Amino acid sequence: MGPPSQLLTLARKAATAQSLDPALVCSVVEQESAWNPWAMRYEPAFFTKYVAPLYTNNKVSATEAYARGFSWGLMQVMGQVAREAGFEALFLSALCDPEQGLTIGCKVLRKKFDALAGDPTRALLAWNGGANPTYAAQVLARRSHYL
């Protein structure tokens, strides 16, 4: 059983809007959330490195800080990364809305491609934060499922 057709349509639309390969974006979604729009995961190392200093310096509330330490939605966009990319919804849980999550996720992924001369392997490793050296190969192996 594959992903719901409406999610595939939204993923392809968001990818195209950012001049990304729709099959690659669908592969990222499969890898990150298995097409579960409500997927979320707390990333303690990310929180400690990137978010805790904001909270410690009273730049954000405790609730907002902890939400920024989670990855959200279909593309598992980190809350902090979404805010840095201009995501303005009151609550970061709005990233679980497929259209909003895919839109901001593709915007962030496009920035990774632009920063890394369009190299898919390097852009995917940057997307994943570099913690998993096999991440890019795993995503690229799934790409053919969405052609």
Residue ranges and their predicted role:
Residues 1-147:
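Catalytic glycan-binding domains that act on GlcNAc-containing polysaccharides
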